[in-house]
Curated annotation (Swiss-Prot):
Belongs to the cerato-ulmin hydrophobin family. Transmembrane segments: none annotated. This is Class II hydrophobin 1. It comes from Trichoderma harzianum. SUPFAM superfamilies: Hydrophobin II, HfbII. It comes from the Eukaryota. It is found in: Cell membrane. Disulfide bonds join 24-74, 35-65, 36-48, 75-86. The gene is hyd1.
Length: 93
C-alpha cells in the first residue's frame, strides 16, 4: 500500500513538472539551465552559473553561455557552482 502511494505521488509530481523550461526539455531530469565551463564524465559540470537573461530556446541559451566562454547544459541538481547529472540541450552544437 505504501508503494502505491509513493508511486502515485511520483507520477503526479512528474506530470505537474515543467514541460520545457528556458531551453531545457521538461521532465524529471535536466530541467535546470546552466552555463558551465568543464564537464567531468557527463556526471558533473564545474564552474557553472545561471543564465542572467531569459533563454526561451536553445539558440539564445547557447549564444548567452558562449558569451561567457561556457557551454549550455541542462542539469538535474545545481550544487555550489557545480551541475550534477547534466546533458546538452537538444539541438545544441
Amino acid at each position: 500500500m505504501k508503494f502505491f502511494a509513493v508511486a502515485a505521488l511520483f507520477v503526479a509530481s512528474a506530470m505537474a513538472g515543467p514541460m520545457g523550461s528556458e531551453g531545457c526539455p521538461g521532465g524529471l531530469t535536466g530541467t535546470v539551465p546552466l552555463c558551465c565551463a568543464t564537464n567531468v564524465l557527463n556526471i558533473a559540470d564545474l564552474d557553472c552559473s545561471t543564465p542572467t537573461i531569459p533563454v526561451p530556446n536553445v539558440g539564445i541559451f547557447q549564444a548567452h553561455c558562449a558569451s561567457k566562454g561556457k557551454q549550455p547544459v541542462c542539469c538535474t541538481l545545481p550544487v555550489a557552482g557545480q551541475g550534477l547529472l547534466c546533458n546538452k540541450p537538444t539541438g545544441a552544437q
